[in-house]
């Protein structure tokens, strides 16, 4: 596709990652940020930054409060540009856009489903959006050519565009993003008084607390922006927690097991790699000796018969003389690799 000239407001994780990818594509771009420190880092990372008077596409990648304040300024200063935001909530900013005559024709809400545990330009990556979903929330009056421009932009970032209404977006992400964040924070708070004995916690607790260290200033804005949907999700969750509590109090083993069984089906609904539709894999387990070059040799075997390894996991303890590599492949590739490894003398097992 032809280059798109960009002006990016906000040089945090998302804005700088967009800039890095645009620089890879040799697109003209300029960066704006009220934080001198963040802007300096972003400009060091993206030396191709330049001044663009009339950008084709403006990206608002600031905090929610700053984004709302920028909308009217950008609408007036850049009357021809297509404008998108990349925030986690959509309804509030869309209402602000609709208050400006004709701006809805060239504004498109968007939300890249990508991130890292730590924000800021120093965490930015040019491949942050590769294979990720990127939600678009076009209004009924958006000009079609602008919608195509943004869709092409998203694809160029390496992401996959999905369309939905602002209302559906905010209701959905209250459940699948905002509620998990609240649960993690509440769980962390509930055990904050524990002493050194907390180090005995297993991986389950560590996994659930991963979100607890998120940026409180940013998340307070997100939660308040989406207040009604978040409260509705919290109420629904509280009802289910009460049901589970009652079942425990009443020694209702059947109800407890029923809830666990129902819950166990949910992970299968979640997409596989990069949030895309889950693929069915066949697993090949390979036991290897703990000596140099074993993993490289195994990958050479895969390459020699041109099979595609979709994912892998390594199980090995420091004092263990052997390790186990689990390879995820398509059914046909798994059959081919399994037979090949057996013939080559590897200790292979197919699941």
PLM ranges: what are they?
Residues 1-51:
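NAD(P)+-binding Rossmann beta1-loop-alpha1 motif at the extreme N-terminus of oxidoreductases
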Residues 6-8, 58, 134:
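Conserved hydrophobic helix-helix packing surfaces used for dimerization/oligomerization
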Residues 34, 62, 86-88:
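Short beta->alpha hinge that forms the Motif I/post-I loop of the SAM-binding pocket
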Residues 58-59, 84:
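N-terminal Rossmann-like NAD(P) cofactor-binding module of classical short-chain dehydrogenase/reductase
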Residues 70-121:
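Rossmann-like NAD(P)(H) cofactor-binding subdomain of soluble oxidoreductases
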Residues 128-213:
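Internal alpha-helical scaffold of NAD(P)-dependent oxidoreductase catalytic cores
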Residues 194-264, 282-284, 291:
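Interdomain hinge/lid region at the active-site interface
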Residues 266-351:
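A conserved regulatory-domain signal marking ACT and ACT-like small-molecule sensing domains
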